[in-house]
Amino acid sequence: MAFIISIIIAYLLGSLSFAVIVAKLMKLPDPRTTGSGNAGATNMLRVGGRQAAFYVLLGDAAKGLIAVLIARFLNVQGVSLAFVGLVAVLGHLFPVYFKFRGGKGVATMMGVLLGLSFWIGLFVIATWVIVVSIFRYSSVAALVSAVAAPIYTIIAGRTDYLFPVLIIAILIIWKHWENFQRLRKGTEDKVKL
């Protein structure tokens, strides 16, 4: 029963689109119809600046972390806990409150990973920061950190988390597919930090 309750909470929390919420609160254009059209922190950086992007990043990561922490509190463990994290990411990608049009899941993945294992989460965040600092492409940082997440999970000895973390990584790569096509064509926008 605790697992089912955790799954429901994770999906409902994951469905909170902080890009849309922050845009409304700050009286900014809807990120789903402006910039890249993505309801995420990188597009909010373009649409509303650093402060708006920071709030979105914080909110999207926090909901993933909180979903996992609630499940931990309810004594959900091992692969079941990692599946709760996966459902939080699915909520972000396909939010029930926003007609199933969500973001790409990177910040939520980071929050989930911090909740599963502080060190795995920290290394994934560090990987993203290093890659975006070098290449200035959020999509490249997303790809590298998504690929790194299952690798770090194995290195940390948390093979019980591996299958759900692998699914999260595949979903994030899939959601960035258009970005990778733009990278190939040389039309992908760089991030201005």
Curated annotation (Swiss-Prot):
GO terms for biological process: phospholipid biosynthetic process. Coiled coil: none annotated. Its EC number is 2.3.1.275. GO terms for cellular component: plasma membrane. It is a multi-pass membrane protein. It comes from the Bacteria. Disulfide bonds: none annotated. It catalyses: an acyl phosphate + sn-glycerol 3-phosphate = a 1-acyl-sn-glycero-3-phosphate + phosphate. Keywords: Cell inner membrane, Cell membrane, Lipid biosynthesis, Lipid metabolism, Membrane, Phospholipid biosynthesis, Phospholipid metabolism, Transferase, Transmembrane, Transmembrane helix. It is found in: Cell inner membrane. Pathway: Lipid metabolism; phospholipid metabolism. The chain crosses the membrane at residues 2-22, 51-71, 78-98, 112-132, 154-174. Pfam families: G3P_acyltransf. One of its GO terms (molecular function) is acyl-phosphate glycerol-3-phosphate acyltransferase activity. Probably interacts with PlsX. Belongs to the PlsY family. Catalyzes the transfer of an acyl group from acyl-phosphate (acyl-PO(4)) to glycerol-3-phosphate (G3P) to form lysophosphatidic acid (LPA). This enzyme utilizes acyl-phosphate as fatty acyl donor, but not acyl-CoA or acyl-ACP. This is Glycerol-3-phosphate acyltransferase.
